[in-house]
UniProtKB/Swiss-Prot annotation:
Keywords: Activator, Nucleus, Transcription, Transcription regulation. GO terms for biological process: regulation of transcription by RNA polymerase II. Gene3D superfamilies: 6.10.140.1520, 6.10.140.200. Disulfide bonds: none annotated. This is Mediator of RNA polymerase II transcription subunit 7. Its main location: nucleus. Component of the Mediator complex, a coactivator involved in the regulated transcription of nearly all RNA polymerase II-dependent genes. Mediator functions as a bridge to convey information from gene-specific regulatory proteins to the basal RNA polymerase II transcription machinery. Mediator is recruited to promoters by direct interactions with regulatory proteins and serves as a scaffold for the assembly of a functional preinitiation complex with RNA polymerase II and the general transcription factors. It comes from Aspergillus fumigatus (strain ATCC MYA-4609 / CBS 101355 / FGSC A1100 / Af293).
Length: 261
């Protein structure tokens, strides 16, 4: 009881909800067993099934296992993160919608009520960012002067600094779509350059391989020609030897005939 009365220490993030204690290995195994039992077919064998949160909630789960069922994914509205409500809309709300004074001019906005309100964008955001940065330096010097003369009058200057910082951050957030688009263009250009370099390297390798094959082909023709020449010479020599043998045989026959006479 004494510990319950103690104030909770301030932290950057809120503590997890108490339901995390139900995420034990035993409870997870029990939930898997229930899912297998519920997914059995007519043959009594469990079937593979992708369970949705609604189907899991329809099962007869004990109270300690109901916390293991994930909630439905929010499709519209807001959701809570560490006790703070976050909007599902990706549209950046304008400073006027947030009740904050806007220190730079706005572009004309669309008046169509069917379309979601789009944030107003300055004509030259870089110029106004530089202007707000200089105003921040000036207001900070004034803030230091107030603290040195009348510290109790610091609140108004703190509000001015806060408003300047919010306007600067809003301008930066308005520039993020352009930054993302430019970053995507750079990434695509780098990928295109890499593809071109790879194609050039493949063309170079293709030319080298073709040259090597042509060289082998030329060497093969030379070898065939040399082999054919050697075969011709050998054939001629064989023919000459045969003719000489025939001549010797004929001469021997005539010599024998002459001796017989």
């Amino acid at each position: 009881m004494a510990e319950a009365g103690k104030p909770r220490p301030l932290t950057a993030f809120a503590p997890p909800p108490p339901l995390w204690k139900h995420f034990t290995q035993d409870n997870l195994k029990r939930l898997e067993d229930i899912k297998k039992e519920a997914s059995k077919g007519e043959d009594g064998k469990p079937r593979k099934k992708k369970w949705t949160p609604a189907e899991l909630r329809a099962l007869q789960l004990p109270p300690e296992l109901r916390f293991l069922v994930p909630p439905e994914i929010p499709k519209s509205g807001q959701y809570s993160v560490f006790g703070e409500l976050q909007s599902l809309s990706t549209t950046l709300p304008s400073l006027q919608e947030q009740g904050i004074e806007q220190l730079y001019p706005s572009t004309p906005t669309e008046t169509d009520p069917d379309k979601p309100s789009q944030p107003s964008r300055p004509f030259n955001h870089a110029y106004y960012l530089l202007k707000i940065s200089k105003s921040l330096l000036l207001n900070f010097l004034e803030f230091v002067g107030i603290l040195s003369i009348a510290p109790e009058q610091f609140q108004s200057k703190v509000e001015d600094l806060r408003n300047l910082f919010i306007n600067a951050h809003h301008l930066l957030n308005l520039y993020r779509p352009h930054q993302a688009r430019e970053s995507l263009i750079m990434m695509m250009e780098e990928q295109l350059n890499r593809s071109r370099e790879e194609i050039q390297q493949m063309d170079k390798m293709h030319a080298e391989i073709n040259g090597f094959l042509e060289q082998l082909k030329a060497q093969g023709i030379d070898i065939d020609s040399a082999s054919k020449s050697r075969e011709d010479v050998t054939a001629k020599r064989a023919t000459g030897d045969q003719d000489a043998n025939n001549a010797n045989s004929s001469r021997l026959v005539w010599d024998i005939l002459d001796g017989t006479d």
